Amino acid sequence: MAVQTFDVIVIGAGPGGYVAAIRASQLGQKVAIIERENLGGICLNWGCIPTKALLRSAEVFHLMHRAKEFGLSVTGVAFDLNAVVARSRGVAKQLSGGIGHLMKKHKVTVFMGAATLPAKGKVTVKTDKGVEELTAKSIILATGARARELPGLEADGDLVWTYRHALQPKRMPKKLLVIGSGAIGIEFASFFNTLGADTTVVEVMDRVLPVEDAEVSAFAKKAFVKQGMKILEKTTVKKLDRSAGKVVAHLEDAKGITSMEFDTVISAVGIVGNIEDLGLETLGVKIDRTHVVTDEFCRTGVEGLYAIGDIAGAPWLAHKASHEGVMVAELIAGGHPHPIKPGSIAGCTYCHPQVASVGMTEAKAKEAGFTLKVGRFPFIGNGKAIALGEAEGFIKTIFDAKTGELLGAHMIGAEVTELIQGYVIGRALETTEEDLINTVFPHPTLSEMMHESVLDAYGRALHI
């Protein structure tokens, strides 16, 4: 079979890969993209999108139980887990099909199969129909990541699940253990707990959502406990003993080892990059444990080879991958894109209440030597939040006292994942406290709390 030549080959069609392919095509490049599973990658098929569909079902279920608060009468509230999962899978299927349409629209050649790199500038694709040989001056690695599995805690799909199993559960857990309280673990804990599972969350660090500001973590823990979750911090899972229909987890904390019985365990202890079976060692690509080492422009050090998204390391966020994809495509086409500033990438967790943040935590800002001005504003002081029946939460802003630079923003409460982008834009534009204070926020909106938090940092809050 004849070798096919392209300007750019993208390996992996997740949010980093397919966006890179689109942008490269827009810039006049002849582009191919290779995907071994489904267009859209983990995010669209097994991560960001289907989990949000599940969580939306849980949110509606929760609101139906609160109907009386809103002057409504509802009886016979129940859920059909199979139908909930079917809706989630349908959403993923719809969007995956949309990616296929985008590839056709932008004249990107799609190869469904597994890729390897036998030499610089060359890619071999094993498809159902045979082997394809491709060449390109520029190759973008966007192969994503998968769930990390620790020895003794490996998933079996029956009693012990990864996120993939949790996204299409064959049964509703009655007594659930979630190992890890990062975004993935907490979102699944929130989903199953809302539907009625007796849920325990184990976290090895000293607090849940450990990457968040300490005040947000503390507030989240109280909210989760109020919802019926058990939160065990500074605790490790030493061993899982499995038998018919149950798992005995041996948990260790400062007091010693205790044993607890569950019918389901979800392991959410991080992810590892898909770096295997690509031939990276042959090319001399530098690997740091589970990810490819890159510079600020996602260059691997091998001429013409780039790595974006989860395979290139933290933060493991789809929007970071997409932005890197655009940046690399523009670089390949001869442009001069700006490198991404990691501190200006927002993180969002879609538990109840939602959590969102950007920039430094208060502790990190102090460690960096800044003199701070810190503002806080509670949801209970916002009219829209009260009208929505969502008066729990707060917004915290952190400023450099000397320059007025917004160093960080941290939120917990209803719809904060939609609010955080305001502060992201502020950081990108290098706005100061004066710019934010003089901005008119619409009323009545939740966004008014963003303004009030800034005002509070400078002793000017109006509604507390």
Label the predicted regions.
Residues 9-11, 115, 133-144, 178-179, ...:
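Short hydrophobic core segments
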Residues 156-172, 259-334:
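FAD-site-proximal beta/loop scaffold in flavoenzymes
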Residues 48, 143-198, 202, 281-283, ...:
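Glycine-rich dinucleotide-binding loop and its adjacent helix/turn
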Residues 9-16, 25-37, 42, 49, ...:
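Flexible, glycine-rich terminal cap/loop adjacent to redox cofactors
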Residues 50, 123, 273, 300, ...:
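Hydrophobic "anchor" residues
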Residues 2-14, 172-179:
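Beta1/beta-strand and adjacent pyrophosphate-binding region of the FAD-binding site
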Residues 2-6, 22-29, 34-172, 200, ...:
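Glycine-rich flavin
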Residues 15-20, 42, 160, 184-188, ...:
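Short glycine/serine/threonine-rich phosphate/pyrophosphate-binding segments
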